[in-house]
Amino acid sequence: YYDIKIIDALLAERYTGVKSDLILENFKALHEISLKKHPDFLLPRTPLIPGITDTDENLGAIAEFLSLLGVKKASLLEYNPLWHAKLNKLGKDELGAGKSRDWMDKKHVVHCKEIFSAAGISV
């Protein structure tokens, strides 16, 4: 598995602490290697985080990036609000303040999948 969260370098740095450039270059390199020996070995995944990674713009950019590389399959990981309980146990509940505590709407998940399908990528 290889997680691709955000394509935009500045947004990636804001939310993950690092720009996406190296992450994307590493994926390209690993994808090339996997194509030669094990074409189905490397599965790109994108966690769907409300308002951050699940936007049409971001998902469209990820789907386009993967499509240009010839990727035919990816995985979208639905948002799981149970992480709030972990923060509480760690004494870090303030990190989750204002964040969604609801499961993703199924219609929105279908919409996210359709963005990838439109780029020829099954999810």
Model features per residue range: what roles?
Residues 1-82, 88:
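Conserved AdoMet/S-adenosylmethionine-binding subsite of the radical SAM
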Residues 33, 41, 103-123:
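C-terminal accessory region of radical SAM enzymes
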Residues 64, 72, 87-115:
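A structural motif corresponding to the C-terminal lobe/cap of the Radical SAM core domain
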